[in-house]
Amino acid sequence: MKLKTVQEMTLKEKLGQLILPGFHSTYYDDQIKTLIEEYHVGNVLLFTRNFDNAKQMRELTTKIHEEILKHTGHIPFIAIDQEGGLVTRMMKDVTFASGPMTASASIEDATYYTGKMLAEDMIRLGMNLNLAPSLDVNNNPNNPVINVRSYSDNPKVVARLGKRFIEGSSEFGVLACAKHFPGHGDCEVDSHLGLPTINYDLERIHNIEMYPFKENINVPAIMSAHIMFPAYDTVPATLSKNILTNVLRNELGYEGLILTDCLEMKAIADMYGTANGALMAILAGADLCDISHTLEYQIKALELLEEAVNDGRLPVEELDKKVERILKFKEKTLPYLEKYFYNQPMKFSEENNKLAQKIVDNSLTLVKGNNAKLTKDTLVIAPIAIARTIIEDEFDDRNLAKVLKKEFKDLDVRELENTEEFKNKVLSELENFDNVILFSYNAAVSKQQVEFINEVLKNKKETTVISLKGPMDFNKYNNLNNYLCLYEYTPNSIRTVVKYLKEELVPKGKLTIKL
């Protein structure tokens, strides 16, 4: 395959390499057609909204590869946030692997195998850049967006497991992108909705937030955080030359790709504007700008970048360095695309599906007290299955109560309703039950759920709480006697719950944070 060099590219073709745009269809629509055929954009970012099934996705990515090669002279980056677990863009027909809950699973090197499984499915579908893993340290229980997307509250554990995910991903030639530099763990604002600040000194940031990135400084790509670090700069890390160039490039010696998080997130869009944010990020040291949604902003960013080249703010020599870096990493993925994607049959591994389920089964953790026991007079209450944060994905089959009703026909199973009527009815009937099993989901952002569960715990000693999103709900509840946790409300976790309640498995997981 003959690929263009930087020297053979036009200015528009070079600038098109700097944008990582999303679009909103399951087919090659007018938005992506315009970007590729008129603006010579060389990359695409896919989401759940682009995915119906594996056959459709392969047809779409094949078309994208063909058109980008035709209009830019080079292969694309087709990227996706395939962290596993709650941040999983592809769900049907492929391996539904776990996210950082692998840190809790009692399976040797589960994180490596997860990275490898995800990469295998991706490369077979023509995707060569995974916006994972999260190397953020899970050290703030009130963080609304990281939480169980992180491996641990221990920076050394995050660094070690992140490295294994990256190595697993490389087995199938998919480039891993560590995020969110210099660290997104210890904040209480979701950067999709506002601008967080991490107000620590340089020593603390280097020793905690930045440590996993320093230990993985050879990762192919690093994504910046839309977070203020006043110790470094007066602008968010994504727009900070001090952070991206002086610290990451020069001080840490990073030679890979620097990506931004989505510039349509409110942390950037509301204060700086999406298109202007793209220009600021490129001038600060970024190579690729993620603009996930809007054609107007995607085009405006390209126009501003062209103006910056023409007026000298973005020297051609600097632009060429960025493009050369991008092309070099694209070419690393080419042998794997040729082996597994171009003109190859589409196939997926049933063994990977079995291993993915086994990892979830082995992550169930008994945090306090005794295991739950079903009797004919057990009441089970499970929460409504909804995505609690913008970054999470909705799954078609996440109704735990519905599944439990089917599996345990004689059991009183109810879906949690956040109403006074529901709460009062349950409280009035507690004496009719031997014990109660309550499922909790992300208590940090569900005040009514916390109040209800605490009322039950106060009135019914024989109660077991099982968290479906990590152990941190533990700190929200009083009078806890029995507490277990899983780490993601996904179809695999639902299957694990069923096995557990049927006494087909015992908890083997271990905590990854201190409670």
Question: Where are the language model's segments positioned?
Answer:
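Active-site-proximal loop/turn and secondary-structure-junction residues that shape catalytic pockets
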Residues: 25, 50, 82-84, 135-136, ...
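Catalytic domains of carbohydrate-active enzymes, especially glycoside hydrolases
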Residues: 33-47, 116-129
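A charged helix-plus-loop insertion that forms the helical arch/lid used to bind
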Residues: 94-107, 150-152
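Short beta-strand elements of ligand-binding domains
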Residues: 75-82, 131, 462-471
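Short, conserved phosphate-binding/catalytic loop or strand-edge motifs used
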Residues: 135-145
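Preference for extracellular/luminal or secreted protein segments
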Residues: 1-40, 275, 279-515
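Short acidic, glycine-rich surface-loop motifs adjacent to enzyme active sites
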Residues: 35-54, 141-142, 215-234, 432-445
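Second-shell residues forming the walls of enzyme active-site clefts
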Residues: 8-10, 21-22, 28, 49-72, ...
